[in-house]
Amino acid sequence: MVRILTERVIEGNDKYIEAAGLSTDSKPTENIVTGSVFLEVNTGKGFLFNETAGTWVEQ
């Protein structure tokens, strides 16, 4: 289960989030802005969201 640790509304429905979950969890993609952060707790991998591509990019 994905846990949203931080959520800030940027404009309208768009929001910046910092979230954590398992690598098998579906990462959120709707109304998320570039630079949002996701940590896979079971792998230790970190991801940043790319709003233009609509994908999470491993860092």
Label for each model-derived stretch:
Residues 1-45, 55:
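Extracellular/surface-exposed low-complexity repeats and stalk/linker segments enriched in Gly/Pro
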Residues 51-59:
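Tryptophan-rich substrate-binding surfaces of secreted polymer-degrading and adhesive proteins
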